[in-house]
């Protein structure tokens, strides 16, 4: 099992190219099930989750072709991948594959819309809370589907003639459920109105792609999305938007380690709240032609309280990274997690590096320390794993992060991107 070794104490200086967003690429790939034509996606990151989803889609009949020549972006690679599903050959998504990645459960929407029936295993993925499927079931039921849970699977069936447009309001904001209901509604009869919809940029990106395929979607990016059903969708060519979570992660790494880094191929507008929070913590952030420049001013790291919220609030996927930054602040800060109920598993690992963090319910109190000291630590989930890397960049001595397969699910060539900016980071394969 691979480990990441970090020798702390080096500033970051240079250029880091930002990859395509994993959280956008996955639903876009799944949307290929909605058409018999070819969907071409550009700027697809090379990640474990992407590779796994390609296997899952292949089982359903999607032919996947990766361009032989990759678009070289310094130490990152933006791939162009063609997805063609002439015929859906299997409407069952097995436990063996779905249990490995929660997002693969989202095939339930396109399979139900195109074939009228499917059998999909209940999902797996990061162990950061229950993340129930109730919202998915209720939303699809509103479109006329019958849903039955049997032996760990959901058996879903559309009414004769296909799904029927309806008005449905989510009781709680859910990005995944918004993706699924929006995809399913594109082929439903009539008009669907989704209330309390997720407003994340990745939802907008999916809507833009679906519209390019012939869907009629309006309101994406607001809390009300309207979809006028069409009889079929065609192929399209679409570029995956930049990864705002990767962008924020590297910005926090610079704030933690110090230095001067330009983040290329990204957009400051994707994460206004997080960047404003970083500025309050002492980072100097300015927009460039195709990204941003991040520096840490001489005042050090200031304590800042945050509360995670759905977009446009502070992203839960940056919570662990920000907590790592606050361990070196000049005072006391608080991090409150409102999205997931079990997303503080990185706390005990940060404590191994010398962090002072106490928990009270869904709030963590962080007392900044003068220094962190390297130690062996263990990744518990995707975002927690990179928070340990960020802490290791500023820790004295050597930090080793084990179970980095979590890291490979969401960060493309992290060691290479940090190393080219002066960090001492290496992967140790065993």
Curated annotation (Swiss-Prot):
It is found in: Cytoplasm. UDP-N-acetyl-alpha-D-glucosamine binds at residues 102, 131-135, 172-175, 317, 339. Phosphoenolpyruvate binds at residues 22-23. CDD domains: UdpNAET. SUPFAM superfamilies: EPT/RTPC-like. GO terms for cellular component: cytoplasm. It comes from the Bacteria. Keywords: Cell cycle, Cell division, Cell shape, Cell wall biogenesis/degradation, Cytoplasm, Peptidoglycan synthesis, Pyruvate, Transferase. The active site is at residue 126. One of its GO terms (molecular function) is UDP-N-acetylglucosamine 1-carboxyvinyltransferase activity. It catalyses: phosphoenolpyruvate + UDP-N-acetyl-alpha-D-glucosamine = UDP-N-acetyl-3-O-(1-carboxyvinyl)-alpha-D-glucosamine + phosphate. The modification 2-(S-cysteinyl)pyruvic acid O-phosphothioketal is found at residue 126. One of its GO terms (biological process) is UDP-N-acetylgalactosamine biosynthetic process. The keyword Transferase applies. Its EC number is 2.5.1.7. Pathway: Cell wall biogenesis; peptidoglycan biosynthesis. Gene3D superfamilies: Enolpyruvate transferase domain. It is an enzyme of class 2 (transferase). NCBIfam families: murA (TIGR01072), PRK09369.1 (NF006873). PANTHER family: UDP-N-ACETYLGLUCOSAMINE 1-CARBOXYVINYLTRANSFERASE. Belongs to the EPSP synthase family. MurA subfamily. Cell wall formation. Adds enolpyruvyl to UDP-N-acetylglucosamine. This is UDP-N-acetylglucosamine 1-carboxyvinyltransferase. It comes from Rhizobium etli (strain ATCC 51251 / DSM 11541 / JCM 21823 / NBRC 15573 / CFN 42).
């Amino acid at each position: 099992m691979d480990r990441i070794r970090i020798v702390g104490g080096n500033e970051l200086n240079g250029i880091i190219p930002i990859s395509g967003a994993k959280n956008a690429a996955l639903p876009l790939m799944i949307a290929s099930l909605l058409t018999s034509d070819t969907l071409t996606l550009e700027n697809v990151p090379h990640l474990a989750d992407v590779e796994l989803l390609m296997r899952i889609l292949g089982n359903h009949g999607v032919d996947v072709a990766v361009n032989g020549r990759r678009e070289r972006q310094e130490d990152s690679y933006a791939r162009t991948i063609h997805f063609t599903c002439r015929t859906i050959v299997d409407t069952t998504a097995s436990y063996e594959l779905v249990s490995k990645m929660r997002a693969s459960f989202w095939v339930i929407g396109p399979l139900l819309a195109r074939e009228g029936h499917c059998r999909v295993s209940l999902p797996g993925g990061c162990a950061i809370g229950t993340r129930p499927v109730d919202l998915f079931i209720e939303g699809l039921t509103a479109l006329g589907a019958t849903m039955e849970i049997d032996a760990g699977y959901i058996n879903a069936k559309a009414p004769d003639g296909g799904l029927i447009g309806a008005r449905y309001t989510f009781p709680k904001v859910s990005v995944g459920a918004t993706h699924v209901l929006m995809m399913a509604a594109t082929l439903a009869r009539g008009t669907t109105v989704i209330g309390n919809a997720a407003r994340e940029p990745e939802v907008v990106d999916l809507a833009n792609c679906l519209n390019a395929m012939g869907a009629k979607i309006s309101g994406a990016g607001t809390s009300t999305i309207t979809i006028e059903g069409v009889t079929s969708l065609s192929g399209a060519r679409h570029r995956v938007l930049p990864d705002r979570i990767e962008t924020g992660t590297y910005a926090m790494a610079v704030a933690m380690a110090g230095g001067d880094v330009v983040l290329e191929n990204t957009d400051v507008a994707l994460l206004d709240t997080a960047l404003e929070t970083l500025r309050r913590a002492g980072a100097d952030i300015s927009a460039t032609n195709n990204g941003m420049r991040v520096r840490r001013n001489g005042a050090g790291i200031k304590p800042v309280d945050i509360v995670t919220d759905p977009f446009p609030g502070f992203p839960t996927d940056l919570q662990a990274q920000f907590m790592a930054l606050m361990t070196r602040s000049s005072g006391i800060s608080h991090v409150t997690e409102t999205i997931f109920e079990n997303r503080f598993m990185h706390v005990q690992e940060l404590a191994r590096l010398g962090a002072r963090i106490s928990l009270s319910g869904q709030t963590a109190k962080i007392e900044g320390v003068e220094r962190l000291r390297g130690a062996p630590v263990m990744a518990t989930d995707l975002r927690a794993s990179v928070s340990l890397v960020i802490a290791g960049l500023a820790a004295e001595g050597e930090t080793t992060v084990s179970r980095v397969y979590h890291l490979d699910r969401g960060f493309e060539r992290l060691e290479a991107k940090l190393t080219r900016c002066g960090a001492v980071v290496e992967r140790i394969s065993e």
